[in-house]
């Protein structure tokens, strides 16, 4: 079964996203967004070239993206579903099918300013 590895930058992104979600929308909203992120990461690990994922070679070689909106239904839980997720997972398929999660960025950001230059 494929696995994923989260970069330090992506880990910091997740912490920031969940902190902001908690502060602005409360604990249940944070829990919903956390479940959504986990569902998206697992979906990417299971099927890296899944429907909804995009080749992003224009940003960096081998880079792919997947918007959290595509994992909304899989992340549905007791407290509901995230209605309008706004983040994109940027990742690469590495050796041995290990998925490298590079960043999680807001979809309104100029992503090229926040991605590693490789």
Question: Where are the regions that the model predicts?
Answer:
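Enriched for short, Lys/Arg-rich terminal
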Residues: 75-118
């Amino acid at each position: 079964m494929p696995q994923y590895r989260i970069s330090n930058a992506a880990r910091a992104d997740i912490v920031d996203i969940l902190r902001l979600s908690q502060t602005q929308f409360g604990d249940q909203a944070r829990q919903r967004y956390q479940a959504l992120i986990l569902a998206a990461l697992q979906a990417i690990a299971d099927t890296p070239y899944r429907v909804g994922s995009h080749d992003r070679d224009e940003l960096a070689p081998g880079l792919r993206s997947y918007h959290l909106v595509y994992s909304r239904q899989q992340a549905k839980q007791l407290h509901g579903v995230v209605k309008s997720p706004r983040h994109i997972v940027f990742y690469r398929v590495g050796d041995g099918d290990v998925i490298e999660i590079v960043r999680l960025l807001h979809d309104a950001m100029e992503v090229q300013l926040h991605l590693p230059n490789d």
